[in-house]
């Protein structure tokens, strides 16, 4: 709680005074996980029944600041709110770069848990409702249909995969989408955008999560959330 900044953010590591460690970090659900912990503390869920009220109050305040940060960092493209980058600049709140292959983008992976967290809020404000609605719309329009992973052994005897056509497979979402035109892209350690996963090297292709189906969770929970909150 002491480390949470005035701008209501949490960075990835502390103390790390420079580099991407200072960014607002949604990557690997870092901020969402911390917020869920804070909520368990102020709600005095097991094993936190012993926590004094003074600390619970601070945890609640920190959680609320986290929600404020999420609302402020939702990326707006061409006047329309979308989702989030895996990390945002701690000063400007703009999408930011982390490791060489983690470029400023819209995240089809980290954004899912952010939306699910927002949908868990009781009595959501209109601002929260709008944020959720816009993010879910992005998930609906950004799904990738008609492909699946096919694993194989390459010429060097290593396990690898490629994306192949599939007519009846569930939709996927890319890890990263361009900020210019919402196009899925991939990067190697040289930081160059590629638009076909076969164009990056074996090490990064297999050592990082480039596709996921977590958007299905968002869409399912969204329908439940609408009914619970009587949203048309």
Model-derived segments and their meaning:
Residues 3, 61, 83-87, 130-133:
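Short sequence/structural elements of tandem HEAT/ARM alpha-solenoid repeats
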Residues 1-9:
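Single conserved hydrophobic/aromatic residue that forms the stacking wall/gate
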Residues 69-86, 147-154:
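Positively charged
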Residues 10-26, 90-104:
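A cross-kingdom feature marking solvent-exposed beta-strand/loop segments within repeated
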